Amino acid sequence: MTVFADILDTVRRHEPVVHCITNYVTVNDCANMVLAAGGSPIMADDAAEVEDIVALSQALVINIGTLNSRTVESMLVAGRRANSMGKPVVLDPVGAGASALRNSTLQRLLGEVRFAAIKGNASEIGFLAGKDAKARGVDAQDSCLVTEDRLESAAATARHLSESTGAVVVVSGAIDIVAYSGGAWAVRNGHPLMARITGSGCMSAAVMGCCLGVAPYEMPQACLCAVSALGVAGEIAAETMVGGGGEMGGLGGGTGSYRALLLDAMSLLDGLALGSRADVTRIQM
């Protein structure tokens, strides 16, 4: 996994500016995760300034978690500006399929902005791919969760969406999938506690912004690096909390402690550790 180590170390060296137009539930988590990954976050969301902010940034992350008419316009303006400047744009279609506003907003975004990557849970990706998937709030339906038995079908759905949009498609879950027209990969890093804190998916998109910001011409590799890095950090955080030999010893605690330890683990993660722990395999289709 040398390429992942190289990308993560490049993020640390170059500190890419990542512009996030995200939801107010996890905006602080995303900003801190960008910092932990080695980037520099800016969370501006007013349409009057987003073009200027995009010009200063290396990547743009759009998250529709808490939509309103003001931020929808900001997303469109920022996305078009990023496209005109050749800067990668990440879409996190939170709650796709849950409401008419989300669906119409996604239709506009996908029609007017070219995305380097689209990251969502299995229900969200299934909805965008035209499958019969419905949202359960911002979480995936149980019938859509990615398991070993459903891995190939989920990968095929992700690849279909990639081919129709030109974006690398990431399906988040217990097993993560990264797909594009050239193939699909399974990432088996992470820990169940990641699903017990709000914002872990949003943080993943933010880390993708960091990696794409330094490797815009290696989009699949950048997305794989981001997904595996956050997963490895999640594993280390759990090991640290329960006393399995983490750097800080066994601290105990619950989900609040885990959230902080996840940031700690990402901030301490280096390319060597990522390369040795990343569990990425190609999905045969």
Curated annotation (Swiss-Prot):
Keywords on record: ATP-binding, Kinase, Magnesium, Metal-binding, Nucleotide-binding, Thiamine biosynthesis, Transferase
Lineage: Bacteria, Pseudomonadati, Thermodesulfobacteriota, Desulfovibrionia, Desulfovibrionales
Superkingdom of origin: Bacteria
Annotated function: Catalyzes the phosphorylation of the hydroxyl group of 4-methyl-5-beta-hydroxyethylthiazole (THZ).
Cofactor: Mg(2+)
Family of the protein in this entry: Belongs to the Thz kinase family.
GO process terms (BP): thiamine biosynthetic process; thiamine diphosphate biosynthetic process
Stored Pfam families: HK
Residues annotated for ATP binding in this entry: K119, S172
UniProt gene name: thiM
HAMAP family from the UniProt entry: Thz_kinase
Pathway(s) the chain acts in: Cofactor biosynthesis; thiamine diphosphate biosynthesis; 4-methyl-5-(2-phosphoethyl)-thiazole from 5-(2-hydroxyethyl)-4-methylthiazole: step 1/1
Enzyme Commission number, as recorded: 2.7.1.50
Record GO terms (molecular function): ATP binding; hydroxyethylthiazole kinase activity; magnesium ion binding
Residues involved in substrate binding: M43, G199
The protein, known as: Hydroxyethylthiazole kinase
Record field: catalytic activity: 5-(2-hydroxyethyl)-4-methylthiazole + ATP = 4-methyl-5-(2-phosphooxyethyl)-thiazole + ADP + H(+)
InterPro entries: Hyethyz_kinase (IPR000417), Ribokinase-like (IPR029056)
